[in-house]
Amino acid sequence: MMTQSIGRSMLTVMATLPLLFSSATLHAQANSVQQQLEALEKSSGGRLGVALINTADNSQILYRADERFAMCSTSKVMAAAAVLKQSESDKHLLNQRVEIKKSDLVNYNPIAEKHVNGTMTLAELGAAALQYSDNTAMNKLIAHLGGPDKVTAFARSLGDETFRLDRTEPTLNTAIPGDPRDTTTPLAMAQTLKNLTLGKALAETQRAQLVTWLKGNTTGSASIRAGLPKSWVVGDKTGSGDYGTTNDIAVIWPENHAPLVLVTYFTQPEQKAESRRDILAAAAKIVTHGF
């Protein structure tokens, strides 16, 4: 639980700090980050999960990073990546057209609704899902793959034993406290996002496409991005659901520094609670200070 996560976090935060500092200074700085995250969480009235990976040395900053949180639309990254993986062996796959019917529309379809009685390519569906969080696009990607369990199977193929997708949009966003469906942990998601965008989980062309989609996201300006210097390049995917669940996962390219991978998950005790993107921005500012 939290004690284990904080203890683990303190060790990994310390690993990111310059070796010239005394151990006392290292401990003080690690404590400061943890105390700031704990204070932020306490003031919010919710539960906050954070995982940051510094790819310069693979050190980590973790807070409740091994606890499960509902992914909501951050799960769209896994579905889109699974389709990209298929395209490695079928160079024409992303041009495959998918019919869009009025009956396909769900609660949020800013792109798909413009194509009712027409078609969209799998590439267009991937872009709509990741850059506009289009729920019909996500459902079409899931259907193409063969169901939510196939998205989970793709995660397993990457070595991610934590991710699980059980439902489609919009029911995957219920975010009921204690419900394991459609959840992961901040650390598991951070490790997988790193593998997908900066590692070898995808071939170079597919990896570049995923990064391009994430950099073009239109929904994240008030979340992680809001807590970072404007000169930093960010690719991210947001998510939100019941219980005020507010999420963002990002790959960050600071100036003159190796990329950072950051996952921020937040949820609240009341089902009708409002989203709190400001909490994600504040968490991002805390954990990236000094980079």
Swiss-Prot record:
Reactions catalysed, as given in the entry: a beta-lactam + H2O = a substituted beta-amino acid
- Per UniProt, what is one GO molecular function of this protein? beta-lactamase activity
The question of whether Hydrolase is a record keyword is answered with yes
Which keywords does UniProt give here? Antibiotic resistance, Hydrolase, Signal
Q: Where does the secretion signal sit in this chain?
A: 1-28
Which cysteine-cysteine pairs are annotated as disulfide bonds in the entry? none
Q: What is its EC number?
A: 3.5.2.6
Catalytic machinery residues: 73
Q: Which InterPro entries match?
A: Beta-lactam/transpept-like, Beta-lactam_cat, Beta-lactam_class-A, Beta-lactam_class-A_AS
Biological process (GO), any one: beta-lactam antibiotic catabolic process
Q: What does this protein do?
A: Is probably capable of hydrolyzing cephalosporins such as ceftriaxone and ceftazidime, thus conferring resistance to these antibiotics.
Further remarks about this protein from its record: The class A beta-lactamase family has a specific amino-acid numbering system, sometimes called Ambler or ABL numbering and often misspelt as Amber. A multiple sequence alignment was used to derive a consensus sequence and then the consensus was numbered taking into account insertions and deletions. This allows use of identical numbers, e.g. for active site residues, despite differences in protein length. UniProt always uses natural numbering of residues, hence there appear to be differences in numbering between this entry and some papers.
Similarity comment: family membership? Belongs to the class-A beta-lactamase family.
- Its name, as the record gives it, is Beta-lactamase CTX-M-97
Q: Which organism is it from?
A: Escherichia coli
Gene that this sequence comes from? bla
